[in-house]
Amino acid sequence: MVKRILQYFRRETVLSAALICALLSFLLTPPSVIHLQGIDTTTLLMLFSLMTIVAGFRRMGALDAVSRKLTRRVTTLRGLSAVMVALCFALSMLVTNDVALLTLVPLTLLLFRACGQKSTIWTVVLETVAANLGSMVTPIGNPQNLYLYTSGRLTALDFLTLLAPYAAVALALLMALCLLLPRERVAVDTSARAPLAGKMLTLYGALSALALLAIAKVLPAWALAAAVLLGTLALDRGTIRQVDYTLLATFVCFFVFVASVKACEPVRAWLETMMARSPMAVALLTSQVISNVPACLLLSPFTQDAKALALGVDLGGLGTLIASLASLISFRLYGAGEGAQKGRYFAVFTGVNVLFLAVMLGLAAMRN
């Protein structure tokens, strides 16, 4: 049992780091009610609800079926890559960057192998960038946006007006980089298993409608979570097991850590000083080290400039492999495949990310 627990924490490095930070933070501030008060239950309930709904759609094959249908008329390797990258970009806005990659990267690997294409690195790397940058346009595109939205720091319109220009430039560059692949003709296998029973589609369609009401803040987050939990327990219990509870636990640990930091006056004063100077730069650089979701949770209480924070953590998903949890997901999925060239993947990933980060920072400089 102990061995399995240790293996789990070795595998989930981000959660392990978050837990260590939370425990060490008790040296700054002894455990008290402030740590419980620091846990943002609205964000956790929304995140749980959205992950459950998307897991339901994935489980019944709906996302896979849509993806295969959209690639049905593709006849070239270049076209296949462009369609999959564009799908990642668009899907990430609706179901989060993590889920977009969990759905489309395995499908990409499958389709490329069926076409006789062994090297998928270029396409998977571009899909990862597409998911990270496409997701920043909407409040539900990634966990850090959802946190800033549910905590009342930014509105849906704020995300759109602030980040859409960056996303548009990123999409154009992504499509241009797809042109580097050859126009080699391929035969794409688009056969797909039929989705599950219609009652599942009705269930998750209804829950999606409730989620839209919760996102619009018409329905309380707890009411959505209750409906999701009761609905899935009654009709589709298997979906509950597919929710990413590791991400939820990571959020809880960082909420506890942030509560300790806020209660420690010297550390609080230092962070406020740093964030007052350049919130975007601090957020971006912090993301490179601890990933952009934890960076957002850590830095949010210490700045009033939520837009600069959002820009910093969203663009901060570019750069290092650990800058975004979604990037680690892609790397794991690719690395688990037969004949994976992890060293080459890392080199291509780093080069492409540096390129996009330079372009995005150049655009930011032009807009300021």
Spans of model-derived segments:
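Hydrophobic mid-bilayer segments of alpha-helices in multi-pass membrane transport proteins
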Residues: 2-28, 39-52, 201-210, 218-233, ...
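Flexible interhelical linker loops that connect adjacent transmembrane helices
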Residues: 4, 68, 180-205, 237-241
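Interfacial loop-to-helix junctions that mark the boundaries of transmembrane helices
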Residues: 5-11, 33-43, 154-166, 193-198, ...
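Transmembrane helical segments that form the transport core of multi-pass membrane transport proteins
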Residues: 38, 60, 64-69, 207-304
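Membrane-interfacial loop-to-helix junctions in multi-pass transporters
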Residues: 41-43, 72-85, 114-123, 199-202, ...
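Hydrophobic transmembrane alpha-helices that form the pore/transport pathway of multi-pass ion
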Residues: 85-86, 90-133, 297-311, 339-341, ...
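Membrane-core helix-loop-helix motifs of multi-pass transport proteins
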Residues: 116-183, 187-193, 330-360
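C-terminal transmembrane helix pair
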Residues: 160-171, 281-368
